[in-house]
């Protein structure tokens, strides 16, 4: 279920003026509650994986520990999560960036080396990347291993269904069992509900 539209690689024109209103929640204007942080959240089939910049890090161990201590999250230690991280890294082809750093990033690399700081190349979820530099506007060559080109097609191949332009409002429950999902249809531009349920 996705609130936004279904877009494919042929729709990604590498134009910010088109991509931001079409692919981002609130046209890239979504903010944290206090307005201090812009939240880059996708609004199309594939969600935020469609518009992220492909950096693929494992959740840091201190973060996992914080979740356990503050929120009581169990079964998510670094050791517990390691096989799941490995599985997703394989599925999404996560590997260090294959090309040397560009000129501006090479300055950072040289600075790190002169200051004695450790650095390494960012791990990315790509396969056959052309390094066009427009990851945040949808990948026009399907190299980014977003849910649009990985998990969703795999689910559809196994008989799953895809519902888009549908805002999920609430789960329908019978006791502790989910029996359905109440959705509200969205208009073609995904700006407002169209009244369909």
Predicted regions and their residues:
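N-terminal glycine-rich phosphate/pyrophosphate-binding loop and immediately adjacent elements
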Residues: 1-67, 78, 182, 194
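Short, glycine-/Ser/Thr-/acidic-enriched flexible segments
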Residues: 5-6, 57, 167-169, 186-188
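Flexible, glycine-rich phosphate/dinucleotide-binding loops
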Residues: 7, 128, 190
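Pocket-edge structural micro-motifs
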Residues: 41, 52-54, 121-123, 164, ...
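A general structural signal for short secondary-structure junctions and capping/turn motifs
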Residues: 41-43, 110-111, 153-154, 196-197
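Conserved redox-cofactor binding core of oxidoreductases
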Residues: 70, 74-171, 175-178
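Conserved beta-strand-loop-beta-strand element in the redox core of flavoprotein oxidoreductases
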Residues: 170-197
């Amino acid at each position: 279920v996705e609130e936004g539209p279904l877009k494919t690689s042929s729709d990604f024109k590498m134009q910010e003026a088109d991509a931001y209103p079409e692919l981002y929640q609130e046209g890239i204007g979504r903010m944290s509650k206090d307005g201090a942080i812009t939240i880059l959240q996708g609004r199309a089939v594939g969600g935020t994986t469609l518009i992220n910049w492909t950096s693929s890090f494992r959740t840091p161990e201190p973060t996992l520990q914080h979740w356990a201590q503050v929120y009581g999250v169990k079964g998510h230690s670094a050791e517990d999560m390691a096989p799941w991280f490995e599985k997703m890294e394989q599925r999404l082809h996560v590997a260090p960036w294959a090309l040397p750093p560009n000129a501006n990033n090479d300055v950072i690399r040289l600075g790190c080396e002169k200051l004695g700081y450790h650095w390494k190349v960012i791990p990315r979820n790509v396969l056959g990347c052309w390094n066009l530099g427009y990851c945040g506007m949808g990948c026009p060559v399907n190299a980014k291993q977003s849910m649009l080109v990985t998990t969703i097609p795999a689910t559809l191949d196994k008989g799953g269904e895809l519902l888009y332009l549908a805002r999920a409002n609430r789960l329908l429950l019978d006791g502790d069992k989910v029996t359905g999902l109440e959705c509200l249809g969205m208009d073609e531009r995904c700006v407002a509900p169209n009244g369909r349920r």
